């Protein structure tokens, strides 16, 4: 099966100078992929020429006359720029010409345009950015990582339901554990939104383990961590900054003297493994969960190496049937929730259900 993806080539801080080389490199290592490069045709072809890929059969150029800037208001992207590379790329997914869209564009605009073009799954008011973050024994699914800055309690409940369904579908876990990111484990901690969300989660049929703190994110304390997009995005980028700082410190220390440089040569295999594990670029690309089609959000600041990883996220998600599994799990969860007697102010669907086993890294986080 050929995996067909649309690439919003104009999105992000660097546009075609990053997205096109990443696409070229990706198709050269994945013969079953076809990428549709959407954007200003002359700019895309100029980059293809630089990459000596003008005749690459696995790449096609789809013209779009407008660009959603990183600082464009949502209403501009949604109402005025109807021929933007972002909108055209999503339209191709909606029409069935492609199976997923990858964009490094403006997060707010991408969420709004995706909701308008692709629509959300039943019972979901807002999509959320979800990603499988590494822990010592596997992965922790965390959402939202930036799609929704302000959330109501019922939105956090819906994020938990989507995270539950995704982990159940990918890993076959009947009752994935859920944690609510907070400033303390105690029930009395947090703002009113968090407290109310905790009440809804405790009243639901989810396997809610209570509040978790920032230092639990990489411990594997729970299978799914739920937070609003403001907190999630800050936590994610803080982690990336810390990883970069650690790598820089180690490099600096091993460069201090001739002896330390000799030690670095001896420790090179270990250092290379460490560098690979903490390189945040290989974790680029997260699913915009809750839509009827697949959308992968890349960091706007991604370089070509990082953006290639984002393309790989979409490719893996299609190959592993992530959307189909998630939709099936959400549908299976709906009936038990209807009988749970939840507070009328609650919303969404989730209950114990099992899906087909699959390694999360193979579905959303792998690279070959």
Curated annotation (Swiss-Prot):
GO cellular component term, pick one: cytoplasm
Keyword Transferase among record annotations: yes
Keywords from the UniProt entry: Cytoplasm, Lipid biosynthesis, Lipid metabolism, Phospholipid biosynthesis, Phospholipid metabolism, Transferase
EC number: 2.3.1.274
Class of the enzyme per the UniProt entry, highest EC level: transferase
GO biological process, one term: fatty acid biosynthetic process
Region (Disordered): 334-368
Pfam families membership: FA_synthesis (PF02504)
Reactions mediated catalytically: a fatty acyl-[ACP] + phosphate = an acyl phosphate + holo-[ACP]
Single GO molecular function: phosphate:acyl-[acyl carrier protein] acyltransferase activity
Database matches in InterPro entries: FA_synthesis, Phospholipid_synth_PlsX-like
Covalent S-S links between cysteines: none
Associated pathway: Lipid metabolism; phospholipid metabolism
Cellular compartment(s): Cytoplasm
Main location: cytoplasm
UniProt key word Transferase: yes
Family: Belongs to the PlsX family.
Subunit structure: Homodimer. Probably interacts with PlsY.
Function: Catalyzes the reversible formation of acyl-phosphate (acyl-PO(4)) from acyl-[acyl-carrier-protein] (acyl-ACP). This enzyme utilizes acyl-ACP as fatty acyl donor, but not acyl-CoA.
Name assigned to this protein: Phosphate acyltransferase
Gene name of the record: plsX
